[in-house]
């Protein structure tokens, strides 16, 4: 039964093709990362959206949702996501694949590094979606993060402040992993 479910899930993933990238960005950093990810995934410009524009109709257009946020203050979600999360919680995500990414500062905010990713995960984990793009914590320096579940990040953390030299490689590796999970 377990192998049958795995095979069915793999078949469903292969059928997924329409990807929407949604980001919440105050300073522009998360938007820049979103656009890099979209480019690597061959997502057209028209399928890249600010989280503040999220609607149920827009969610229905996509099989795969790539959601990006920055982390603010004491580990808070970026403002554009508050209404976006409400939309996502009401939407039918049971047949959607969700990949999360986020920007944070592992030096100045080491105890809340990329918590925004974890907040999105917590908000969406009971919606029936399937999360893809889990990332190993190896190679990251931080004290704590709610984005770490069972020893792994539930998405891709990016630190453009202290580790910007690693951003392109991290995106490349993550996107390659996403492509395998989607195809």
Locations of the language-model features?
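Short acidic low-complexity segments
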Residues: 50-58
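N-terminal beta1-alpha1 ligand-phosphate binding loop
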Residues: 18-37
